[in-house]
Each structure stands twice: as C-alpha cells, then as structure tokens.
Amino acid sequence: MTNITFSETFDKVQECFEESSIKDQLESITIIRDVQGKIRLFLEPLENKNLEDIILNHLEERLENKLVSYYGHDIWLPQGEKDGYKNLIDVIRSERVSAEWDDESQPRWYVLERHVAKQAWTNKKETEPPWPQKVVDQGHKPAIVSFFSFKGGVGRTTTLVATALTLARHGHQVAVVDLDLESPGIFTFFFPDREKSLPGIIDYLLEKNIQGKNWELKDHLESFKDENLLGDEDRILPILSAGNVDNNYLEKLARLDCQNLLNVNNPLEKTWSDMFKELNEAASDKFKELNEAAGKLDFILLDTRTGFHDLGGLAIAEFSHAAVIFGTQSRQSWAGLTQVIRRLAKPLAPEALPLLLIHALAPGIGVPGREQELRKFREDAYSVFQDHYYSSSEDVPNSNGQEDRFYPIVIDWQSELRREINLFEYSAVEEDSSLLNIIDILTGKPYQRLAERLCRLFNRKLNLKN
C-alpha cells in the first residue's frame, strides 16, 4: 500500500472506476473532496438499475487501496423522498460542477470541493458582475476593469494611473478604485498628506452594514482635477480610496471577512455589489455638476491585491467585465499567471473573461537581449492561453494576432518612474521639465496602446474628442 498526495486523489478515483464494471451502470459520479482533502462519492445509477452490494464492496476495496488515508469511507446513493439523506443529496446536486475531464459521455463526472478559504479563486460556477456585460457593450453602464499582478513591483498601480489619465485625456469619464486594502497607495498619487482624509472603501464596507442608507458613498468620493493632466479644465477623475491609513485602519481591516466572501452568510458580497452601483451614480452626478452633457461614467478601474488574495480573486473573477494582468518573463511569474488565466477562462460560463496581458518591466529599446525576451514572452503567453484559456470548441487565433488577448502589451522598465510619483505637484508643470517628462511617459505610446485595446474590448473608440 503506497501513500499518495492530495494532487493525485482525482486520478486515483478515476483509476478505480476504469477497473470496475460498475461504471457501465452509472448515470453520474460525483467526487466530494472535503476541507482536509478526503474523498467521498455520490453515485447515481441509470434508471431501473440497482447497484449490488458485492459490486459496491469491490469498489470500496479499490478506493481504500488507491486512496489510502485520503478515502473518507462514504459512498452515497440516491434514496426515496423520505430518506434522511435527501437534504444532503439536494445540496450535492445543486453545488457540484462538471469535472474538468468530463466529456459528457456516460457516466457524467462531477466534482464538489469544500474549502476553508479562497472561494473567489476556486469557485467554478458562473457569476454576474454588478451589471451585465450586455449593457456595458451597449454603452449604458461603465466597464469595470481590474488591474492584477501575481507578483508585486511590476508597475501595476502606476499603469492603472497612466491608463486612467490616458482615457480621461481622450474624452472618457473614468473613476479609480483602490481595492488593495492591505497595501493601499492610489491616494498618494493624486493628493498630499492630510490631517483628515475622506473615508474610503474600508469605511463603506463597515459603516454601510451598520448605518444603511445614512452612509452614502457620494459624500466620500474624492475628485482629482488638473487641466494639465486630464486635458480639460472641466474634467475630473473621481477616486475612491482604500481609506485613511490611521491608527484605526488595522482595526477596521480586521473586521472584514475576506476569506469567505462568497459565503451566503457573509453580508460583504452584497455590500460590494451595492458599492459599485452607488459609485456609478455618485461619479455620474459629479460629472453632471461640471457639465450637464457629460454625466455618464465609461470606465471603473480597480487596483487589486497582488497574488492569490481573496479580495483580488473576487475583483477579477466576480466583479469585473475585463482584467488587465501583469507578468514578467520569469518562471515565478508564469507559474502564477497560468493559474490566473486558467481561472478566468470560466469553463462553466458562456464566455471567458476578456483579458489584456502586460509584459511588465521589459528591457528598454537598445538593451541587449530585449528582442529575445519579448519573443519568449509572446511564445509562452500563446502556449498558456492555448492550453488554459480557449475552450476546446473555439478556434485558437493565429499566434501573430496582435489584437488577440494572448498578445502582450509591452511596457518597458522606466527609471523615471522608480521614484514616488505625486501628480498633485503638477500645478506649475510648464515650469518644471522633469514633471512634464513624467506626464509624457504616463500618457505615452504603451499606455495609449493599452487604453486603445481596452476600449476595443467594449466596442468603444479611444479618442472621443474628434
């Protein structure tokens, strides 16, 4: 008897059925893997088929032999309406999802996973963002777009800020949201330190559940205004910060259950959805105050938490209409990005989540090895998308398709962006060439290319001024 690991359990279960005649008598097989990783089964026989005890006993023996300590010693079968297991069976049927290896032949294979945390990353069921993709494509609602990086230090937040500025300068109405609650930073780009800042997301999530309608997001939405940066004296950039990082911030953060965001008993999920709806209304009202004709929000850009954090998973997989994901040419980066791309393929949804891939920190023009790295990143991206993003029923695009989702947008490493960027210092930009240079970089070709491709995802044009 050989010990096995967690990663081998599903394969071992399949081996047990390949070696047993019981497979021909079943309509479906559901593998239930509990929080410890132990395996139990729910078997549904074909109509008018009764599974004999001797066959079930042989299956039990095989499961014990192959799964060893990972076998949970339970095989459940459908029973009559009065059976005590009925509620359990109903839960299994409602929560299970098709197994990745299921080919829709008999018997069907299903999986039901039990988790302690990371539901946002492991949830395989189809979900809906705060408003449907259809109304976004029709231009009736803003597109919610998450900026995500598996590793830190790749310029994600800076790229989000640059994209927001680029979109705004071309006539789009944009709002920025700092969802990186454990490492907030968006606020410092746009505003100086204050003795007392406006409340942010962390306050909304706590106060809304206590105060209800008495706590309105519109009273706490910051507005950044700068003609040099936004291209129009009447244009603003609404910003919802993470919150004021003061002596109470950690106490507030400690009261948010981010590990069970998809749990039906966790009120936060609905609060999140309500927040985006309030944000859309509040930002639109701010635009109308400046210009009655410009009262509609086009984009909401979310800065998310690095890595497999529950909140980052919730943002890109549950709330967003698209995601911008960042990677570097390294094994570490591709190991994580592969799983992110696999998750966002949404195998049970009609379509995968639209993605844009950023090749971050790429060598600059003239740096030795640049072309080799760019080529290798493109090749790896195509391979990962081919294996994990496109469904078996889709035709995979040609590897040279520069507008396809796997084709990376290259953002070179910029020494000028290494220092802290304070956009609120730009009030006298014409007198300071170094600050003017920063503006040129943040609204330069790579970010224009990103903004243009982002607009195309939603059937929009980048330049609305012409």
Per-range role (PLM):
Residues 6, 156, 264-275, 332-336, ...:
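Phosphate/oxyanion-binding active-site loops and adjacent basic polyanion-contact surfaces
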Residues 229-239, 296, 351-353, 402-407:
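A short helix-to-beta-strand connector/capping loop
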